Amino acid sequence: MSGERAKRFPLALEDLKRAPRKSDGRAGERHAAIAAPKAADKPAAVPKPVALKPGVARMPPGTAAAKPATALKPTVPKPAMPKPIAANAAPAGAFALTSERVRERMVERLRANGVTDPRVLDAMAAVPRHLFVDAGLATQAYEDSALPIGHQQTISKPSVVARMIELAMAGRTLERVLEIGTGCGYQAAVLSHVARDVYSIERIKPLYERAKLNLRPLRVPNIRLHYGDGRVGLPSAAPFDAIVIAAAGLDVPQALLEQLAIGGRLVAPVGAQSGQPQVLTLIERVAHAQWRESRLDRVFFVPLKSGVI
């Protein structure tokens, strides 16, 4: 090596390779990081699998052993027991049916179908029909359809109830009304809004009891229910301004015609023979021994029977 070159490079090239120049700590760290993979060239020892007992965890050396866990039985929630539902109560899903708006829509349909007396329409709007049918039928309570109430009997369609009451009233103020066939009590409840006193007879004892239960929450003071034969009527309370019969016979019993006041009106379905259509019939008593009959609409009712059960 020349003198000038020796001054510039005091160490031989071999020495530079054997003793590399040290650098600051950060550079050393960088070299260490770069050199780290070389150290990893040697495969690490793989620990042999250790058979563990069920439920025991293998802990690293120097770690305090944890207390064995206590096995807990899974908590199974008890199913909620359904609350009993009253026979005439509307289900929760039918809550909207209890609103006045639903009854108002029913009244709008009645008005569109020809019912014009505002007292009848107000009475139909005031009585909650869903309280008089079984809970399973509550969603149909305000449809214009007859519904079963048990014992092979039905609650009449709202349009038929309104039509019969309007015919019986004929624009008059009713004092005393007789209903034959209480059923579930719905028509009697409507009549109580347009008459001073309502007398209603039911021949089927379970329906008579059911009507009392249905009417009790409404606290209707002017309805008098009777258990007996409707074909006989109620002579002790006669004469009546109006009589409404909610069952169809071959004719109207003479006993009921005799209990109608002069000027009074009786409304009943007539014609119960097999294959014979029933016709809604209006009978007016014009004198002591004279009645006038008008045959009106085709209808369908359960038969009018005698006796009690």
UniProtKB/Swiss-Prot annotation:
Cellular component, GO, one term: cytoplasm
UniProt-listed PANTHER family: PROTEIN-L-ISOASPARTATE O-METHYLTRANSFERASE, PROTEIN-L-ISOASPARTATE(D-ASPARTATE) O-METHYLTRANSFERASE
CDD domains xref list: AdoMet_MTases
Reaction catalyzed: [protein]-L-isoaspartate + S-adenosyl-L-methionine = [protein]-L-isoaspartate alpha-methyl ester + S-adenosyl-L-homocysteine
EC number: 2.1.1.77
Originating organism: Burkholderia vietnamiensis (strain G4 / LMG 22486)
Family: Belongs to the methyltransferase superfamily. L-isoaspartyl/D-aspartyl protein methyltransferase family.
Annotated protein name in UniProt: Protein-L-isoaspartate O-methyltransferase
Keywords for the protein's UniProt record, in alphabetical order: Cytoplasm, Methyltransferase, S-adenosyl-L-methionine, Transferase
Highest taxon above the source species: Bacteria
Short name of one Pfam family: PCMT
Location of region: Disordered: 1-46
GO molecular function: protein-L-isoaspartate (D-aspartate) O-methyltransferase activity
UniProt biased composition (Low complexity): 33-46
Active site annotation, chain numbering: S156
GO biological process: methylation; protein modification process; protein repair
Chief location of this protein within or outside the cell: cytoplasm
Subcellular location(s) of the protein: Cytoplasm
Gene that produces this protein: pcm
Function: Catalyzes the methyl esterification of L-isoaspartyl residues in peptides and proteins that result from spontaneous decomposition of normal L-aspartyl and L-asparaginyl residues. It plays a role in the repair and/or degradation of damaged proteins.
Origin organism lineage: Bacteria, Pseudomonadati, Pseudomonadota, Betaproteobacteria, Burkholderiales
Biased composition (Basic and acidic residues): 14-32
